[in-house]
Structure formats: C-alpha cells, structure tokens
Regions:
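N-terminal secretory signal peptides
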Residues: 1-9, 19, 26
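Boundary at the C-terminal end of the N-terminal hydrophobic targeting segment
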Residues: 32-34
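An N-cap/entry alpha-helix motif that binds or orients negatively charged groups
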Residues: 41-129
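N-terminal functional module of multi-domain proteins
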Residues: 91-177, 184
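Active-site mouth loops of central-metabolism enzymes
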Residues: 138-148, 198-204, 261-266
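Short hydrophobic alpha-helical runs that function as membrane-insertion/retention elements
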Residues: 167-172, 196-198, 223, 283, ...
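Alpha/beta enzyme core
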Residues: 204-315, 328-329, 333-336, 342
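Helical hairpin unit composed of two closely spaced alpha helices linked by a short loop
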Residues: 345-348
C-alpha cells in the first residue's frame, strides 16, 4: 500500500511558530526536573547531568519495562511487553503511530515577519506555553520498574512541566488501588501543581468518586481513557473497568464541573458520539498500540476525525511524540494540543 506523504508549511502552524518549537516543545520543556539553563550546551536543565547521562540512568531504572531506545518506534526489545511501554502483540499499532507521523513532512517558510514565535495556547481558560501536556501515566510499580516512588514521579513530571509553562498530569492507573491515586493528588495539592488527571473507565460510582477527589485537588481538566476497558489488565482483582454506553458518557459529563475529555477515540463516528454526549474534548489515541493490536496510527486517522469535529470540541492526540517537530506535525493536521508519554517519563529519571 502506498504511503501518502503530507507537506505543511510551518508558517501556517501555531500563529507563525517557527523551528524554535522543536527546541521549546520537547527538548527543554519535558525534562521533568526542569530548571532552565541559558547556556547553549548539552548540559541538562539542572546543570548536573547530560541528556545521555539521564537516558543511561533511565535505562538502569526502567529496563525491562522500557529500554530507552535511541528512537522510540515500537521496534525495540519492548515488543509485546504489556504492562510496560511496549505495544500489544507484534507492536504494529505502536509502529503505525510512528510510521504515520513520519509520513507527515514539513516545509519551511523563510519570507515572513515573525521575530518572536508564539507557541502558547489556551487550555480551558489556562494559558500554557505550548501545545504539549504530559500524558497521564500510572503504575510506577508495574509500568516503570518500581524504582521511582509515586511522590518522586509526580514531583518530576508536574514540577518540570509547570516550570516549562505547561501542565503536568497524574493518572488513576488500572491496577492502582484508591489510596495510590489519593497519594498522587495529595502531592499535587502540597506543591500547588497545575495538572490534568486521567481516569480509567471504572464503574460509574468509582469514576465519580475519583472526579470529586480531582476537583478538590484543583485539577484543570479530566480525561477518561475509554479504550482501557479492552486491556488485559481489566482482569485485575478488585479493579473493575468496563465499556461505556452513550448514556453513561452523558452521565459522566454531567457529574463534574471540570472539562471532561474522552480518550481512545480513533473514528469519526465515535468522535461524534462524544460531542453529542457533551464532552469538552476528545483524545485521538490507540493507547500506544497497547489495547488492540494492528490499529492504524493516530496521525493517519486524525485528519478525518478533525473534519468530523469541525471545531465543536477540543481535539488532543498522542502517539510517539519525541521532539518539537512531532508536535508541529500533529498541530498541522488538526490537533489543538498533544499529550506526551514516554519522552517525558524518561526524562523524569534523575
């Protein structure tokens, strides 16, 4: 099958954002222990470790859950490793994310009057420095090797993202009991972090209970990754997750005063259902290829979904984001904002 390549001008992305987004979006901002360094060197944002030293440290702490490959494309030793950050089965869904994004190419525009690129956006009333937010990630014990405490992880992710001018995230991991989720929220409250929260499609009463806790913690927005109902981990004893009907989606939207985005949307018809249920937004995501094998890549399905949405809700996307140009591509083909997973998680190690 022929791969269609798409070309976009950076001039048309992010109100004239130029190549500096590549440096701003992931190279500096996603380092989870960020303290900005003005020196144009490869020293890290803390001034204590180089980027490669951080990656080596991450390998020590995350193998075999993640091997911190030079290029995170679903073709490394992590294939089929779930829990962890590998893709389901032969990891073709993970690989499709990488390949579909790689097929999008950028053209530069050199004749313009933009001297200071503005990459900031409004996220439900909160101005953030770029269309990049940490993706909610749970399970430091079973997804990340268990060598990082919950408090360390939340401080790293949310502290670094906030210093970079964007939002961190905490998650309600599918195998995490309620006290673990409460501990993460408590860390947010203690430090005053600005963040989003990702919830699992648990029983309605359990979701609403977690919504209330998130509201008390001062969260900016909520996501529910509906596709987690199809994960093997749903069989975890005492941690029930389930598919949601249209009526259940409407109930959840009404249950919280916070903006609610439904995650795991990969088709235009389900985007329409979410809009009709009253969702503030959707997240185009195949869960990193970790819920269903052989899914298409998110960059492949995003344009059709955006056409269907037609501005009626906020559209986010995730999938193998590793650098600022990846952000530019997703925004160019229609996303309002991106969620970054592994690049940020790796840089949280110190």
């Amino acid at each position: 099958m022929e791969t269609r390549r798409m070309f976009f001008s950076r001039r048309n992305i992010l109100k004239g954002s130029a190549a500096s987004l590549a440096a701003a979006a992931l190279g500096s901002s996603s380092a989870a222990f960020a303290q900005q360094s003005s020196a144009p060197t490869i020293r890290p944002l803390t001034g204590k470790m180089t980027y490669e030293e951080v990656r080596n440290r991450a390998r020590e702490m995350m193998i075999p859950r993640c091997y911190v490959c030079p290029e995170c494309n679903g073709r490394g030793p992590c294939i089929g490793q779930v829990p962890g950050f590998g893709g389901m089965g032969a990891s073709r869904g993970f690989q499709a994310n990488y390949d579909s994004l790689a097929a999008v190419q950028l053209n530069s525009r050199v004749v313009h009057g933009v001297h200071v690129p503005d990459t900031s956006i409004d996220f439900f009333g909160t101005k953030i420095s770029m269309p990049v937010i940490a993706a909610p990630t749970g399970g430091t014990t079973y997804n990340m090797g268990g060598k990082l405490t919950e408090e360390e992880f939340v401080n790293a992710i949310c502290g670094g993202c906030n210093k970079a001018g964007t939002l961190g995230a905490v998650a309600d991991g599918i195998g995490d009991p309620l006290p673990v989720y409460e501990k993460r929220l408590q860390t947010l409250k203690e430090h005053g972090y600005k963040a989003i929260v990702g919830l699992k499609p648990r029983l309605q009463k359990d979701i609403i209970e977690r919504m209330r806790l998130a509201e008390e913690a001062g969260i900016i927005a909520l996501t529910i990754d509906l596709d987690s109902a199809g994960r093997a981990a749903r069989a975890t004893k005492g941690q029930t997750v389930e598919p949601k009907t249209f009526e259940q989606l409407k109930e959840l939207v009404k249950a919280s005063k916070l903006p609610l985005l439904f995650k795991g949307i990969m088709t235009p018809d389900e985007a329409e259902l979410c809009i009709n249920a009253g969702a503030a937004g959707i997240v185009v995501s195949n869960h990193g290829g970790r819920t269903l094998a052989d899914t298409p890549g998110t960059a492949a399905v995003l344009p059709r979904i955006v056409d269907k949405v037609n501005g009626r809700c906020f559209v986010m996307v995730d999938g193998t984001l590793a650098r600022g140009t990846d952000v530019e591509k997703y925004v160019a083909i229609g996303a309002d904002c991106t969620l970054v997973v592994q690049s940020i998680n790796t840089l949280s190690i110190k």
